[in-house]
Amino acid sequence: MVNLTSMSGFLLMGFSDERKLQILHALVFLVTYLLALTGNLLIITIITVDRRLHSPMYYFLKHLSLLDLCFISVTVPQSIANSLMGNGYISLVQCILQVFFFIALASSEVAILTVMSYDRYAAICQPLHYETIMDPRACRHAVIAVWIAGGLSGLMHAAINFSIPLCGKRVIHQFFCDVPQMLKLACSYEFINEIALAAFTTSAAFICLISIVLSYIRIFSTVLRIPSAEGRTKVFSTCLPHLFVATFFLSAAGFEFLRLPSDSSSTVDLVFSVFYTVIPPTLNPVIYSLRNDSMKAALRKMLSKEELPQRKMCLKAMFKL
């Protein structure tokens, strides 16, 4: 039994105290994590290997998959280990790192989704200037800005959140170190800086959402003027998955962060945290690949008998270096 008064870390309550449910939770999360790992690694590999996919759209998609891979790895493996051991304790250093990487990667994901929507807008609404707008250098700078902005956001949240004096027991009613849940432990009126920073971050995310929506309003108005039904279908099949992913992620995360914290644990908190921490990284590979003919063709080519020997030779050459 963990001593709540003397421990320097935190106690993550997770989903249940019953041993059978803890094992079930660990198994479900393990299967989900392996699916997310496989799907995102497959997308990264396909885009890297197939030269036909070396375009801005797939370049950003590769970085989204990399972000998803890192994002789900921040929370799920720790939660699986805690459930298997029947111990929800997490050290202070682990919690600080988890908050930093969680906020950094979530912020980067919002930013990359915004960049991807602008890329689609430029490709469809300004096709004559697309190669100039989204040249390789601009794409690299956009991705670098995404990662730097996410890192700064995570650094600020971690620094401010862990400088707040804690007055309550170090019990977090979540399966990871969730900032809104941690604010419940803060002394009265001592977390105004974190609330101000959270408000700024939420405002930035809202601006990103508005940018995405405006981009797609312009995109759909342009698409509806395309005379060919086949052309409209092709554009919709490319754009709708991205719009769904962005809306789902931002809506679930926004609902969780904008809710007023209560003193008791809530099933709603746990459900919505799963919606924006576990489900998007798992479903994104499926959403982007199933409706994308180029991705499916590249996957078939990579798995074909003619291509497999060449892939093996490339891998052997890489390992020899």
Curated annotation (Swiss-Prot):
Gene3D superfamilies: Rhodopsin 7-helix transmembrane proteins (1.20.1070.10). One of its GO terms (molecular function) is G protein-coupled receptor activity. Glycans are attached at N3. SUPFAM superfamilies: Family A G protein-coupled receptor-like (SSF81321). Its main location: membrane. It is a multi-pass membrane protein. Keywords: Cell membrane, Disulfide bond, G-protein coupled receptor, Glycoprotein, Membrane, Olfaction, Receptor, Sensory transduction, Transducer, Transmembrane, Transmembrane helix. The chain crosses the membrane at residues 24-44, 53-73, 98-118, 138-158, 195-215, 236-256, 270-290. It is found in: Cell membrane. Residues 1-23, 74-97, 159-194, 257-269 are extracellular. InterPro entries: GPCR_Rhodpsn, GPCR_Rhodpsn_7TM, Olfact_rcpt, Olfactory_GPCR. One of its GO terms (cellular component) is plasma membrane. Belongs to the G-protein coupled receptor 1 family. This is Olfactory receptor 14J1. The gene is OR14J1.
